[in-house]
């Protein structure tokens, strides 16, 4: 299997349903625009779903776990063993995203792409093993071509499963010690930014730790300066879980499944996905603005205005999950409010 599928055409939102939804908003018992962005969200979901009655009840959340070779450079406040330990925590339902998924009634898929502290087979974890970790990006490319292909395909597999369940919204999350370093390096390469602009605290680095992370990213960028395409930059600087998110976003757009993007790492993956296949952008909505330093720059590059700003920096799809009730409220208002004619209320 090649990577050619990632360049395939994306679905197109329904312009007729967008117009119909806009027309309904104008007739609801409220001043025009009084519900602000909630009105825009309802219209957007209606166009995505090709329906006059948009809904965000069937939600698929996929969390991809993978380790990074660059962790050997000391770029995280936590040991690498945490990635595997968190996979167990996801499976047991103790992680933040597991709690949120239960609260939302969402399907939670956890995918183990390769961790150093391997928990083995777990009943609630899909094993899509590639390697114990990527290679150290300061020494060599993060992935081989085959590993990149497999990681992209792992994300696409999630979408195939989600589509079979008639999913109305896909949310991608990640877990991997060292992945803010990989995401920052990838963002720098794609946006021609200096590492100081994108490298942040990650799991809780102090100023000295962030300065060291900047040095590590600078070394990685110098080593891979000849990577000239988004796909090659992903292969050299990314991670298994970042590539899986890229594959999931592209496959979702091709399948016509809306995507709610999480924080810094998920947004780095979204940037790669849109560079590889520009049609993906129409299917992306951004859940929140992370506290991670580089997130704002990535959002600007995508012309994205996130729904929330709560100073989150956990990952796991947690910030996007917190935004889902806003989408549900937008749809409920759109579907349930009376029109002026129905309510016998005078229009302006």
From Swiss-Prot:
GO terms for molecular function: nicotinate-nucleotide-dimethylbenzimidazole phosphoribosyltransferase activity. Pfam families: DBI_PRT (PF02277). One of its GO terms (biological process) is cobalamin biosynthetic process. Its EC number is 2.4.2.21. Pathway: Nucleoside biosynthesis; alpha-ribazole biosynthesis; alpha-ribazole from 5,6-dimethylbenzimidazole: step 1/2. It catalyses: 5,6-dimethylbenzimidazole + nicotinate beta-D-ribonucleotide = alpha-ribazole 5'-phosphate + nicotinate + H(+). Keywords: Cobalamin biosynthesis, Glycosyltransferase, Transferase. The active site is at residue 316. Catalyzes the synthesis of alpha-ribazole-5'-phosphate from nicotinate mononucleotide (NAMN) and 5,6-dimethylbenzimidazole (DMB). Belongs to the CobT family. This is Nicotinate-nucleotide--dimethylbenzimidazole phosphoribosyltransferase. It comes from Xanthomonas oryzae pv. oryzae (strain PXO99A). The lineage of its organism: Bacteria, Pseudomonadati, Pseudomonadota, Gammaproteobacteria, Lysobacterales.
């Amino acid at each position: 299997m090649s990577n050619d599928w990632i360049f395939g055409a994306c679905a197109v939102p329904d312009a007729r349903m967008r117009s119909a939804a806009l027309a309904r908003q104008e007739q609801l018992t409220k001043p025009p625009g009084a519900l602000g962005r909630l009105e825009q969200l309802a219209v957007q979901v209606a166009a995505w779903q090709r329906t006059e009655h948009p809904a965000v009840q069937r939600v698929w959340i996929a969390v991809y776990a993978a380790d990074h070779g660059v962790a050997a450079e000391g770029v995280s406040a936590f040991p690498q063993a945490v990635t595997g330990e968190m996979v167990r925590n996801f499976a047991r339902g103790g992680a933040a995203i597991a709690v949120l998924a239960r609260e939302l009634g969402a399907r939670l898929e956890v995918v183990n792409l390769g961790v150093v502290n391997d928990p083995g087979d777990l009943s609630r974890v899909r094993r899509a093993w590639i390697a114990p970790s990527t290679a150290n990006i300061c020494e060599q490319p993060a992935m081989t071509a085959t590993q990149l292909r497999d990681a992209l395909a792992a994300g696409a597999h999630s979408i195939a499963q989600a589509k079979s369940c008639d999913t109305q919204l896909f949310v991608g999350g990640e877990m991997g010690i060292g992945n803010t370093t990989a995401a920052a390096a990838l963002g720098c390469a794609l946006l021609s930014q200096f590492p100081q602009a994108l490298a942040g605290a990650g799991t809780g680095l102090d100023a000295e730790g962030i300065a060291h992370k900047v040095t590590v990213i600078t070394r990685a960028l110098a080593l891979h300066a000849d990577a000239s395409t988004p796909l090659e930059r992903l292969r050299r600087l990314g991670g298994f879980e970042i590539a899986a998110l890229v594959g999931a976003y592209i496959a979702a757009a091709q399948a016509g499944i809306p995507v709610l993007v999480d924080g810094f790492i998920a947004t780095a993956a979204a940037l790669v996905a849109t560079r590889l296949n520009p049609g993906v952008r129409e299917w992306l909505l951004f859940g929140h603005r992370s506290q991670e330093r580089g997130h704002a720059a990535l959002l600007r590059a995508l012309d994205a205005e996130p729904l929330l700003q709560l100073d989150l920096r956990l990952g796991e799809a947690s910030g996007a999950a917190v935004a889902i009730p806003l989408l549900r409220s937008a749809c409920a208002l759109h579907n349930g409010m009376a029109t002026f004619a129905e309510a016998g209320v005078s229009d302006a």
